[in-house]
């Protein structure tokens, strides 16, 4: 996919197929998320339909997507380097820096010699430009032809049309320029260098863009890097003279549920399972496992026989044996990776508006280019024909729907990836976009704001003795303070009596609270706040929170809560540290700010540059116009700058 027009076309095609309930296509990640009925339509059917529409659909199970992307980037880089070689040679010949000594063989007349030398240089430039078009620019013409067959157009269509016009006009001038223009006293030129440089700059831009986009997906690669390739399988064959069993290094894909696996200190646990045996120098019957990448907890967790362990976590001290419980795509790590991938591939509401604009963008640019050509030609006559053609070509080249298409998804990919690194799992892009709007947060007390306390704590407040087995979670007070400093009103919901609820609210620094709360009361409060015009986030961890979670504008669940709550929630906090709440809001605000920055740049670029390429300043007597060559450089820069700007979120 070359631009947002492509992703919009693919999405539109998928949504039109019978059996597909919903489809979302991301330009930045080049992925499609499809909810479909396999009884009505198969993956092969989708593949065929997308192929008929002019695009290639790669089914992840067929072959390695990463390998395909690597191979495509290698080809892109090779064509870019070749295009630069053609561009340098073309510039040298067109500028007269290389003559191959042909002037020595020309006839003695100075004018005729100059004419023949120029004609020879033009012919060499023609061959170089043709080779560049056929090899380096092949993808643009193939894509443009496919789009034409389906009555659509994309960024490749603009590149193909502009370079073809420049090449054909230059070819005509090479053989007939003196006869047609020279005889009428009209100065003529060839523009092979422009057609070559357009392709060179566009390919260079795409190379830089792909490298930058690859950086936006670093969080996924980091998560995938937590999955080991092999596992140490405990066989049923005993070691001679001992009661222990032999072990065999096997690919992780061969592990079955129930298999016994040994993991030593520093190695990654390959699958989810239950510890059957553990030992370390500190504790003879336990090992210590680093779960920071999953739960965010900095202190290694002690694991004894009967405890659960998760794929991707690492025994920092000791070794353990475990029985495989969940394998492959069913592990917690695989679920996290899948959730992040789906979130990065989902679309924010603003992106759907941009996609609609992109569908009319290319036809609109083509119309502007035609109008530009006609105005120059009608005002200047035949003498202005070269200028009219160059102006139209510059308009076609400088227009950039790519920047518009990349503005939102690249920022979302980085933002969602950054959140995952902080143990904040975002289920869809709309949640990240909406989170910055919230001005009210409803939070459940038990299990969310507080955790069980093993010791009975007698607390005296206002001559009231409270016996409690709970304590505030670490940093709960600071988290509530930061939320309220951001203008978010916090409402605590508790099933406790008034006195206890008041105590916990005061201790956490929360001004609003409700006591003796029933499950329906949480939903009622969310509805009441929404009726008051507030954007409400709900944070909970239990089954009795699901109704309120489903109703809230943004729903958040604690990762150690129930699966039901996490399924309903749009955002899951894997850590018990409530500072993740203000951190999520802060990240949402920065991501949305970055999206609007990108969109502003993408639109303002087109609004300013298209008239400049058309020569609008000549109306005011200013002799300045962007040439096709520089138009291609600016177009490439606009796309790359949007992606690089999104990458600044990594520093947030």
Residue ranges and their predicted role:
Residues 75-230, 356, 626:
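Transmembrane helix-loop-helix hairpins at the membrane interface
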Residues 17-40, 44, 189-192, 222-330, ...:
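Conserved cytosolic catalytic loops of P-type ATPases
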Residues 66-86, 123, 143-166, 337-369, ...:
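Soluble-to-membrane junctions at the N-terminal ends of transmembrane alpha-helices
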Residues 390, 400-465, 529, 548, ...:
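Conserved catalytic phosphorylation-site environment of P-type ATPases
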Residues 1-121, 237-245, 334, 338-346, ...:
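Flexible metal-binding regulatory segments at protein termini and peripheral loops
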Residues 8, 29, 426, 436, ...:
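Conserved ATP-binding TGD loop and adjacent catalytic N/P-domain core of P-type ATPases
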Residues 99-119, 149, 168, 418, ...:
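Membrane-embedded alpha-helical bundles of multi-pass transporters
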Residues 119-126, 154-158, 178-198, 353, ...:
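Membrane-water interface of transmembrane alpha-helices in multipass transporters/channels
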């Amino acid at each position: 996919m070359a631009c947002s027009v492509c992703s919009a076309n693919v999405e539109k095609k998928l949504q039109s197929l019978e059996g597909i309930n919903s489809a979302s296509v991301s330009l930045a990640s080049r992925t499609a998320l499809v909810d479909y009925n396999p009884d009505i339509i198969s993956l092969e059917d989708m593949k065929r339909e997308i192929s008929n529409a002019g695009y290639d659909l790669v089914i992840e199970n067929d072959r390695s997507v990463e390998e395909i992307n690597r191979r495509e980037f290698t080809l892109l880089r090779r064509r870019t380097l070749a295009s630069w070689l053609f561009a340098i040679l073309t510039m040298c010949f067109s500028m007269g820096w290389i003559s191959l000594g042909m002037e020595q063989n020309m006839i003695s007349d100075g004018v005729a010699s100059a004419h023949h030398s120029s004609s020879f240089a033009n012919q060499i430039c023609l061959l170089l430009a043709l080779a560049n078009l056929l090899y380096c620019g092949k993808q643009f013409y193939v894509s443009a032809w496919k789009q034409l067959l389906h009555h659509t157009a994309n960024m490749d269509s603009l590149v193909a049309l502009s370079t073809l016009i420049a090449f054909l006009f230059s070819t005509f001038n090479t053989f007939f320029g003196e006869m047609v223009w020279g005889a009428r006293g009209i100065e003529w030129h060839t523009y092979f260098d422009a057609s070559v440089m357009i392709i060179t700059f566009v390919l260079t831009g795409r190379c830089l863009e792909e490298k930058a986009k690859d950086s936006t997906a670093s969080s996924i690669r980091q998560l995938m890097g937590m999955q080991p390739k092999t596992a140490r399988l405990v066989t049923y064959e005993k070691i001679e003279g001992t009661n222990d069993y032999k072990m065999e290094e096997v690919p992780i894909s061969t592990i079955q549920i129930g298999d016994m696996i040994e993991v030593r200190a520093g190695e990654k646990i390959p699958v989810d399972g239950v510890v059957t045996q553990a030992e370390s120098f500190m504790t003879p019957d336990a090992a210590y496992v680093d779960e920071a990448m999953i739960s965010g907890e900095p202190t290694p967790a002690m694991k004894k026989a009967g405890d659960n362990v998760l794929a991707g976590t690492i025994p920092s001290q000791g070794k353990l044996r475990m029985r495989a419980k969940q394998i492959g795509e069913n592990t917690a790590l695989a679920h996290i990776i899948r959730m992040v991938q789906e979130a990065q591939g989902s679309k924010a509401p603003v992106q759907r508006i941009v996609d609609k604009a992109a569908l009319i963008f290319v036809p609109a640019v083509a119309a502007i280019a035609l109008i530009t050509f006609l105005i120059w030609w009608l005002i200047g006559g035949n003498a202005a024909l070269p200028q009219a053609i160059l102006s139209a070509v510059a308009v076609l080249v400088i227009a950039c729907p790519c920047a518009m298409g990349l503005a939102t998804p690249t920022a979302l990919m980085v933002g969602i990836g950054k959140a995952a690194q902080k143990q904040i799992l975002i289920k869809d892009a709309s949640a990240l976009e909406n989170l910055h709007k919230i001005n009210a947060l409803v939070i459940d007390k038990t299990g969310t704001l507080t955790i069980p306390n093993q010791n009975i704590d007698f607390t005296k407040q206002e001559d009231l003795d409270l016996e409690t087995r709970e304590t505030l979670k670490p940093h709960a007070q600071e988290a509530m303070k930061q939320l309220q400093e951001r203008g978010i009103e916090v409402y605590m919901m508790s099933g406790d009596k008034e006195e206890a609820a008041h105590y916990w609210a005061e201790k956490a620094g929360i001004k609003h609270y409700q006591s003796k709360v029933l499950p329906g009361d949480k939903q009622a409060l969310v509805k009441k706040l929404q009726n008051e015009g507030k954007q409400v986030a709900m944070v909970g961890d239990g089954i009795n929170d699901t109704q309120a979670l489903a109703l809230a504008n943004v729903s958040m669940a604690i990762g150690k809560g129930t699966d039901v709550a996490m399924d309903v929630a749009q955002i899951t906090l894997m850590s018990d540290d409530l500072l993740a709440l203000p951190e999520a809001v802060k990240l949402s605000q920065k991501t949305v700010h970055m999206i609007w920055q990108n969109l502003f740049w993408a639109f303002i670029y087109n609004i300013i540059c298209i008239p400049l390429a058309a020569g609008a300043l000549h109306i005011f007597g200013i002799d300045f116009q962007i040439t096709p060559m520089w138009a291609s450089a600016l177009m490439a820069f606009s796309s790359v700058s949007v992606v690089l700007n999104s990458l600044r979120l990594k520093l947030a």
